[in-house]
């Protein structure tokens, strides 16, 4: 396992378990088997409809704005060594990334529906936005491969830091310090120079026991997350819900490709299962701001306008907060040249590995 063909299965090759490689056949399989051990694997695409800024945009994204600030390198904001030297840039940015201002998507609610029906074995995510938790999926059902904002601790003595104090610090753009040793506090998200959570490796082979695998909104280009679908046993259906085919999905007789955005894809599957009304109700209940769909549609500002305002405020805040002297910049650049940041293209441990939204196109 871990290596499989990327060649699309011949259309003439019949499925071994499903009646056909269709959404309807998957729904029939789920209901008749019956399926009880679904493993879900997701990436940044599952959160697109939540309105989270597209950090990758070359002209308007947050990443593009960081490029023009007085940083030795935009990626330094997410480097643990740089964070130790100057945590202010990260906390200026954290307000845009922290949970609470974005609502779960229909795809997140679909995962919750799987859990409610007793069918979810485990949910693997590359995202740090905690939207699965906001949708109601219990934390013990989630493997956050790149960590998340759900918890935080001191980077020195590892003492946990209270949630309420962390939320207050992020809201104010302040840097929190440990009450025990005065060390810097950081959310439990994976920075450059840090290992992935042990929970990921402890559960990495869990897909071997699945009776259905659903992959959504990920390019499957970053290891070790990208290898997860290959652990699914032959003969177990794998469903890809994504705008394009990725990884080795589609190479097995029982792989089903739903090439669409994640929300449309889960709606199609829910409709075939007879779950559409339940899914819509769960999604409505998952709105932390308790706005109706009509109210959301009536909101006068477009997503682009909201994003532009958010980026302008963020850039101004970081520009005001971050005042790195020329001498300090020189020292940091020299340190980074001596200890180069990992490259996403070279070994999969770079920015895309930690923050999928920030990956360069």
Swiss-Prot record:
Cofactor(s) the record lists: Zn(2+)
Keyword Zinc: yes
Gene3D superfamilies, sorted: SIR2/SIRT2 'Small Domain, TPP-binding domain
InterPro entries the UniProt entry points to: DHS-like_NAD/FAD-binding_dom, NAD-dep_sirtuin_deacylases, Sirtuin, Sirtuin_cat_small_dom_sf, Sirtuin_class_I, Ssirtuin_cat_dom
Presence of keyword Transport: no
Key words, A-Z: Coiled coil, Cytoplasm, Metal-binding, NAD, Nucleus, Repressor, Transcription, Transcription regulation, Transferase, Zinc
Free-text comment on the cofactor: Binds 1 zinc ion per subunit.
GO molecular function, one term: metal ion binding
Native source species: Emericella nidulans (strain FGSC A4 / ATCC 38163 / CBS 112.46 / NRRL 194 / M139)
Pfam families assigned: SIR2 (PF02146)
Catalysed reactions, as listed in the record: N(6)-acetyl-L-lysyl-[protein] + NAD(+) + H2O = 2''-O-acetyl-ADP-D-ribose + nicotinamide + L-lysyl-[protein]
Active-site residue numbers: 146 (proton acceptor)
Domain Deacetylase sirtuin-type as annotated: residue spans: 16-276
EC numbers on record: 2.3.1.286
Binding site for NAD(+): 43-63, 126-129, 217-219, 242-244, 262
Region Disordered: start-end pairs: 335-361
Coiled-coil intervals, chain numbering: 294-328
Sequence similarity: Belongs to the sirtuin family. Class I subfamily.
Disulfide bonds: none
Protein name: NAD-dependent protein deacetylase hst2-1
Function: NAD-dependent histone deacetylase, which could function in telomeric silencing, cell cycle progression and chromosome stability.
